[in-house]
Structures are given as C-alpha cells and as structure tokens.
Swiss-Prot record:
InterPro entries: tRNA_yW-synthesising, tRNA_yW-synthesising-like_sf
Pfam families associated with the record: TYW3
Chain spans, region Disordered: 213-240
Organism: Danio rerio
Name of the top EC class for this enzyme: transferase
Keywords (A to Z) from UniProt: Methyltransferase, S-adenosyl-L-methionine, Transferase, tRNA processing
A GO term from the CC aspect: cytoplasm
GO biological process: tRNA methylation; wybutosine biosynthetic process
Pathway(s) of this molecule: tRNA modification; wybutosine-tRNA(Phe) biosynthesis
Family in the record: Belongs to the TYW3 family.
Name assigned to this protein: tRNA wybutosine-synthesizing protein 3 homolog
C-alpha cells in the first residue's frame, strides 16, 4: 500500500468522532489501543474490551439486529446477579443474556504487518483472528476469539429460567470475563515484544515466540531494502528463515 494513502486513512480514522454508544475506548484496552496507534504501520479502527449484556428483542421477529433491540443491562466488567434480575424485569419481548469477548480491528500498512499481528493474536489465545484485504487495498487484521455465551432468558416478557439457573449463568459469564482479561494481558505483552525496536532487549519470556516475531519483523523491514552485496550463503540462510516463518502461518 502507498505510504501516503495509509497515513491519510490513519489520520482520518483517528481524528473522527467515536460513534459507539460509550463514546470512548474501554479502559481495560486503552493501553493496547494507544500502543498500536503509536506505531507507523498500524492503527485501530474499532475495539471492545469484552462485555456482558442483557438485551431485549421484538418477539417472533427473525431479524435480530441492533436497531431492533434495546439494552437492558451492559457492563465491561464482571456482573452481579441482582443487576441482571433488575434488567430482566424490564423485558417486554425476548430477553437474551450474552457475553462477548475482546475484539479489535487494526488496519495494517502491508500484508507482512498484518501477518505479524495475526501471529501475536493466535499466540495470545485469540484463535478466531483473521486478515481481510479490501478492494481499495485496505488490510484489516481482526483479533477475535470464540469463547462467547448467548442464552435466551424470556419470551414475550415471560421468564423461562429459574433464579438458580440465572445465578449459574452469571457465574459462567464472569469466568469468561476473567479469562478474557488474561488473554488481553497476554496479547499486550506479546504485542510489545513483537513491535519494540530491534536493539531493545525483549521482555517476552518465551524464546521460541520471540524468534518468530524477530523473523517476521525482519522480513517486513527487508521488503523495501535489498542488500545487493549479500553473498550466496547468506541468501540461502535468509530463504530458509522465510520458509520457516511461512510454515508457521499455515499451521
């Protein structure tokens, strides 16, 4: 991607208003978002640290979209059963209890940059992460996981579950939130290990992963610069490193 186009997109995205319901970046991931946006080759386009929500939808309506739902309760932290019960009392349709894990969308300058970020996400436990390339050349890396939870609680305002089962669901959702926050922390640590300058000492403890990040970072740096004086043996060694890295992304 052309450097000027990428920088223009980055400036436009970071300077526009936040149209989310909350209107700001979630506190638990603000350090991650700030770190990514400080990098020349990345910027975030949307994010959510993870949330527990209770929403009400129109009964017998197959089109369950945000515009057809009302939020009865939402938190980005662990929740209490009393909060869910109070929200459920407001239901006039079909209430659903849901946990949504951390999600982050990052626009990347080059495909190699997205591949590096993808490796970080996978190693941090976000196994559903992926890369998309748009028609205009926009490269988006989405950090996602699959440990969601979605359970219907009422139909036509009639509650379908007992208080005991509701208490169980709240406990499950809170456990998922705890695991979600641990994965965010791992992602933050892996991210800093992968993107910090080459000369700085890496604080990430897993040596194998450091090697992967170092190799991928080296490939990214070598995209625009080729050493014409490189001898045959060095070229062969670098080729083996690139093949090794490519195999990692096929696993």
């Amino acid at each position: 991607m052309d450097g000027d186009s990428f920088q223009q997109w980055k400036n436009q995205c970071l300077n526009k208003c936040d149209f989310s319901k909350k209107g700001s970046v979630d506190e638990d991931i603000s350090h991650v978002v700030s770190f990514i946006n400080s990098q020349d080759r990345y910027f975030t386009t949307s994010s959510c640290s993870g949330r527990i929500i209770l929403f009400d939808a129109v009964s017998d309506c197959p089109d369950v979209q945000k515009q057809n739902c009302s939020w009865l309760f939402v938190t980005h932290q662990k929740c209490q059963m009393e909060d869910v019960v109070r929200g459920l009392e407001k239901s006039v349709g079909d209430a659903t209890f849901k946990f949504e894990p951390f999600v982050l969308h990052v626009q990347c300058k080059q495909l190699e940059d997205a591949q590096l970020l993808h490796t970080v996400a996978i190693n941090s436990g976000f196994r559903n992460s992926g890369i998309t390339v748009g028609k205009k050349g926009k490269i988006i890396m989405a950090v996602r996981s699959t440990h969601c939870l979605e359970v219907p609680l009422s139909h036509r305002s009639h509650v379908l579950v007992t208080h005991q089962y509701l208490d169980f669901l709240v406990g499950v959702a809170n456990q998922k939130m705890e695991e979600n926050l641990k994965r965010i922390q791992r992602f933050s640590e892996c991210l800093q290990a992968a993107l910090q300058p080459q000369e700085e000492k890496c604080s990430f403890k897993e040596a194998d992963n450091k090697t992967v990040y170092r190799r991928r970072r080296k490939r990214t740096q070598d995209v625009s610069v080729t050493d014409s004086s490189q001898n045959t043996q060095e070229h062969h060694e670098n080729t083996e490193e690139e093949i090794d890295c490519d195999l990692l992304f096929l696993l």
